[in-house]
C-alpha cells in the first residue's frame, strides 16, 4: 500500500514542523519513552522480504502450468486471479482483525495463514489438479494481505516521525531483494529437468512453498515471544480533517471514483505484463545468434540451460532463462521506485503520472508492432514506468477527502481485483493472435491512467499540493 502525504493549503506546501531538540537526539529506532525497537524493525524486515519473494514466484508459475497441465494463456491466468482474489477478499477483514488483535496478533495470524497455504502445496502436488494449486496461491495471498496491511504502517511509528520515510524505504528495499530472488528460485524448481531431460517441475513444486512454510512458522514463534509495542498512530494519510466538503458522499468526487477505475486498470495491466513475461521471452523474442551460446559454452553454473532450440528450429530462451530475466524486470521496477521518489518531489504528481502512463502506452505500442529486440527492450522499460503508478493513483484518489479518506482508501485497495480479471482478456487475445498483439490490453489500460493523470486538476478542482512517497504498493 502507498504511503501518501497530503497537503491541502492553497498553492503552498505546509511549512516543516520545528523539530524538538530532544527528538532530534533520538536514534531512528528509539521511541519517546527511550525504548530501542531496532530488533522489532529487524523482524519486520523479514516480512517485507517474505511477501516480495512470494509475489516474485507467482509471476513465473503461469508458464509452468501451461506446459504441465496443457493450458492456454487465458486458462493459466487463473493463477493471477487466485492471487489477487486473496488480496481482494482479505483487504477489509485484515484491517478489522488488525485493530482487534493488535500489531503482534495480526502479524502472527497472517504468518500462520501463509504457512497453511505453503504446507497445502504438499498434498496439492499429489492431487496434481489445477484447482488445488490455485487454492494454495489464494490462501498465501490472503495471509500476505495481513502482513502488508500491518507491516507498512508499523514501520512508520517505530521511532521518531522524521525518520518514518527512511524506515519504510529501508524495509521496502529488502522487499525489492525478495522480489528479485523470487523468480530465480521459482525458475529453479518450476522448470527443473532430470538427467533424461524430462520436466520434474510438478514433482518439486511443493519444495519452495514447504520451505517458506517452515520459515514462516519459525517467524511466527519468534514474533510471539518478541516485544512488539502497540503504538498509537496518527491519521494514516495525514489528511487535514478541516478539509471542507467532506460531508458529501465520496462517490460524488470524480477524482476519487476515477482513481478506483484507474487503479483497477493499472493493476490489470501490471498483472498481465508480469504473468505473461516468460511466455513473451520464450515465444516473441527474435532468434538468438549462435555467438551468444557457442558450442564450448559452459554446461553448468547460473547460465546453464538458458538456451534451447524451439519448435521452429531457432535458438531461443528457455523457461529457466526467462524466469531469471524476470528478475531483471523487477530490478527495473525497483530502480523506477527509487528514482520516481525523487522525481515526485520535484514535479507535480499528476503530471508525472500522466507522462509515465503515456510512456507506457508508447512502449506497449512498440511491443504490439513486433520490432524485434526493440520490442524486447520495451518490455523491460514498462517495468520502470509502472513503478510509481500505484502509490500516485492512491494519493491522488484520496486527496482532500478529510475524514472520508480511510473509507475511500479501502475501495482503492480493493480495485487491485483488476489483476484477477483482465489478464484473462489479455491471454484470450494472445491465444487468438499472439502475445505481442495481446499487449493491446495493457495499452488501453495505461491510456486511461494517463487520461486520469492529465485530467486530475479538473476532476479534483484542487488548488493544493500532493506529495507522494513511492515506498509501498504493488
Predicted regions and their residues:
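Extracytoplasmic
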Residues: 39-69, 273-281
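Extracytoplasmic gate region of multi-pass secondary transporters
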Residues: 58-62, 183, 249-327
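Central cavity-lining transmembrane alpha-helices of secondary-active solute carriers
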Residues: 78-96, 327-339, 418
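Conserved MFS/SLC helix-loop-helix module at the cytosolic interface between two early adjacent transmembrane helices
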Residues: 89-131
Amino acid at each position: 500500500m502507498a504511503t501518501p502525504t497530503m497537503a491541502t493549503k492553497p498553492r503552498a506546501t505546509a511549512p516543516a514542523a520545528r523539530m524538538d531538540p530532544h527528538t532530534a537526539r533520538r536514534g531512528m529506532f528509539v521511541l519517546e519513552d527511550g525504548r530501542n525497537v531496532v530488533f522489532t524493525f529487524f523482524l519486520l524486515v523479514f516480512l517485507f522480504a517474505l511477501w516480495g519473494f512470494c509475489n516474485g514466484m507467482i509471476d513465473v508459475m503461469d508458464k509452468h502450468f501451461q506446459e504441465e497441465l496443457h493450458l492456454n494463456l487465458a486458462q493459466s491466468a487463473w493463477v493471477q486471479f487466485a492471487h489477487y482474489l486473496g488480496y481482494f477478499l482479505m483487504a477489509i477483514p485484515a484491517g478489522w482483525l488488525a485493530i482487534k488483535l493488535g500489531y503482534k496478533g495480526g502479524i502472527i495470524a497472517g504468518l500462520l495463514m501463509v504457512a497453511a497455504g505453503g504446507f497445502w502445496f504438499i498434498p496439492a502436488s499429489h492431487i496434481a489438479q489445477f484447482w488445488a494449486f490455485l487454492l494454495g496461491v489464494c490462501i498465501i495471498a490472503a495471509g500476505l494481505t495481513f502482513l502488508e496491511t500491518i507491516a507498512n504502517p508499523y514501520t512508520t511509528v517505530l521511532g521518531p516521525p522524521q525518520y518514518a520515510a527512511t524506515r519504510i524505504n529501508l524495509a521496502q528495499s529488502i522487499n525489492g531483494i525478495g522480489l528479485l530472488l523470487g523468480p530465480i528460485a521459482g525458475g529453479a524448481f518450476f522448470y527443473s529437468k532430470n538427467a533424461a531431460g524430462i520436466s520434474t517441475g510438478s514433482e518439486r513444486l511443493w519444495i519452495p512453498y514447504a520451505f517458506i512454510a517452515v520459515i514462516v512458522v519459525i517467524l511466527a514463534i519468534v514474533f510471539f515471544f518478541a516485544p512488539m509495542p502497540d503504538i498509537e498512530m496518527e491519521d494514516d494519510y495525514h489528511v487535514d480533517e478541516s478539509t471542507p466538503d467532506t460531508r458529501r458522499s465520496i462517490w460524488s468526487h470524480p477524482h476519487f471514483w476515477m482513481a478506483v477505475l484507474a487503479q483497477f486498470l493499472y493493476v490489470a495491466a501490471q498483472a498481465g505484463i508480469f504473468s505473461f513475461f516468460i511466455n513473451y521471452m520464450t515465444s516473441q523474442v527474435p532468434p538468438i545468434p549462435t555467438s551468444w551460446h557457442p558450442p564450448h559454452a559452459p554446461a553448468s553454473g547460473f547460465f546453464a540451460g538458458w538456451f534451447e532450440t524451439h519448435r521452429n528450429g531457432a535458438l531461443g530462451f528457455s523457461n529457466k532463462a526467462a524466469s531469471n530475466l524476470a528478475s531483471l524486470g523487477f530490478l527495473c521496477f525497483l530502480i523506477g521506485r527509487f528514482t520516481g521518489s525523487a522525481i515526485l518531489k520535484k514535479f507535480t504528481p499528476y503530471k508525472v503520472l500522466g507522462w509515465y502512463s503515456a510512456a507506457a502506452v508508447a512502449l506497449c505500442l512498440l511491443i504490439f508492432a513486433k520490432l524485434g529486440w526493440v520490442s524486447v527492450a520495451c518490455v523491460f522499460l514498462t517495468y520502470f514506468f509502472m513503478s510509481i503508478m500505484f502509490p500516485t493513483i492512491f494519493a491522488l484518489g484520496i486527496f482532500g477527502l478529510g475524514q472520508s479518506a480511510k473509507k475511500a482508501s479501502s475501495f482503492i485497495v480493493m480495485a487491485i481485483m483488476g489483476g484477477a480479471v483482465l489478464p484473462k482478456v489479455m491471454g484470450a487475445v494472445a491465444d487468438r493472435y499472439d502475445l505481442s498483439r495481446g499487449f493491446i490490453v495493457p495499452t488501453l489500460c495505461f491510456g486511461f491512467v494517463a487520461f486520469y493523470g492529465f485530467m486530475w486538476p479538473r476532476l479534483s478542482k484542487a488548488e493544493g499540493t500532493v506529495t507522494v512517497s513511492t515506498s509501498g504498493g504493488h
